């Protein structure tokens, strides 16, 4: 699928980071004979409790969790599949690393979506703030437990590098960063091996796969639940100064998907037509964007359709955020997160961190950081249940807060 130039680039980059294929803690569990070491990292992430909890974090805000829709877990599985295909077509030796990074890329996301991240960052500024990608790194390196002999999952450094989208500390970039301890850890490991790359080929692939899955599959869910129509998203492109260059392409995709849906032999009803239309849309978007990957400004990118990919993500997000239900959902989420933070941060009420799980109490860190760890790992529904436990039954369902 890809030209020789980008394949050669990918192989060169993989060769550079092959120096990072080692674990910091040497430990032989006697159960991994004849297993590829990087494949073990995939299993460790897949079977982690943090990954399982993604099933309770909605990919699209305001969607009832009981409905048949995507959540952060199913989204991560879809990102992993796309990443595997890209890595395979780029002829990487170890495609599983990009796949593992894709499984883990949302593992640090808090309840109640992006706005939950904003609220938690505001509450935890005293101990270095909060950022979803930084939290993912902390979870894998410190919080998750695999064995008593070491903290975290003891993943290969190459795998940890693969989930690092932004290699900055908070002083270098206060929007996208790693926590200071994790930044220093990774910097030390890279320096010790003479690796100067700050974003690995695995991370590049994961990042593109995430954007492609977001563009295609979130659109499908938004259409399925009536949050937006196909005409509306096409119109958003037409009126956007930043993304209007992609309007002709988006129009062509919409028309072609409609033509295919009209011709489908099973489309005897409008409901069947809508199903075929959505599936054709997602397939076309994924195929167009995956096929468009090449070498752009010295790294992986889209040769022609960057505005389409970014526009689908940002314009959909913008359109959905205008909905009243989404505004209420975010406001409710903020109240729950702030309430729980107040409870767990109370030195008298939560003396010796007894309200936190035992595995967090055992970590020697500031109270604010541990409270942030706990809340950020909660599923949306569990956070609401915990809030009601402390503030009274039905309190989480209030829709107006001062």
From Swiss-Prot:
UniProt keywords, alphabetically: Hydrolase
Keyword Hydrolase assigned: yes
Domain HD: 72-215
Single GO MF annotation: dGTPase activity
Pfam families: HD, HD_assoc
CDD domains xref list: HDc
Membrane-spanning residues: none
Leader sequence residues: none
Domain of life from the UniProt record: Bacteria
One of the GO BP terms on file: dGTP catabolic process
PROSITE patterns: HD
Family, similarity comment: Belongs to the dGTPase family. Type 2 subfamily.
Name used for this protein in its record: Deoxyguanosinetriphosphate triphosphohydrolase-like protein 2
């Amino acid at each position: 699928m890809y030209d020789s130039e980008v394949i050669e680039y990918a192989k060169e980059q993989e060769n550079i980071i092959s120096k990072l294929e080692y674990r910091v803690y040497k430990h032989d569990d006697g159960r991994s004979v004849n297993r590829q070491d990087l494949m073990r990292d995939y299993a460790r992430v897949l079977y982690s409790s943090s990954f399982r909890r993604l099933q309770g974090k909605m990919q699209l805000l305001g969607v009832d969790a009981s409905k048949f829709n995507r959540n952060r877990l199913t989204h991560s599985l879809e990102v992993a599949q796309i990443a595997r295909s890209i890595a395979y077509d780029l002829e990487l030796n170890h495609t599983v690393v990009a796949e593992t990074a894709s499984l883990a890329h949302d593992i640090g996301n808090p309840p109640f979506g992006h706005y939950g991240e904003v609220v938690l960052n505001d509450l935890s500024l005293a101990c270095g703030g909060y950022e979803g990608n930084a939290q993912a790194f902390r979870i894998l390196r410190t919080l998750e437990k695999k064995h008593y002999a070491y903290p975290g999952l003891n993943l290969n450094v190459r795998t940890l590098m693969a989930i690092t989208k932004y290699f900055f500390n908070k002083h270098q970039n206060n929007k996208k960063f790693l926590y200071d301890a994790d930044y220093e850890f990774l910097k030390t490991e890279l320096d010790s091996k003479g690796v100067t790359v700050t974003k690995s080929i695995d991370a590049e692939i994961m990042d593109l796969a995430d954007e492609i899955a977001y563009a295609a599959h979130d659109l499908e869910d938004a259409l399925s639940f009536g949050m937006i129509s196909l005409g509306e998203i096409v119109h958003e492109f037409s009126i956007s100064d930043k993304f209007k260059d992609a309007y002709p392409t988006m129009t062509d995709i919409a028309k072609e998907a409609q033509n295919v849906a009209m011709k489908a032999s099973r489309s005897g009803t409008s409901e069947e037509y809508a199903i075929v239309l959505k599936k054709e849309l997602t397939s076309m978007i994924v195929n167009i964007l995956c096929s468009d990957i090449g070498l752009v400004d010295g790294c992986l990118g889209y040769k022609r359709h960057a505005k389409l990919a970014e526009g689908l993500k940002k314009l959909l997000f913008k359109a959905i955020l205008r909905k009243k239900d989404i505004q209420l959902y975010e406001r409710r989420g903020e109240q729950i997160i702030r309430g729980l933070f107040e409870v767990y941060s109370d030195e008298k009420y939560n003396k010796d961190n007894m309200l936190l799980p035992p595995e967090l109490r055992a970590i020697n860190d500031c109270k604010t950081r541990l409270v942030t760890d706990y809340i950020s790992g909660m599923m949306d529904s569990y956070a609401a249940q915990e809030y009601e436990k402390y503030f009274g039954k039905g309190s989480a369902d209030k829709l107006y807060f001062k």
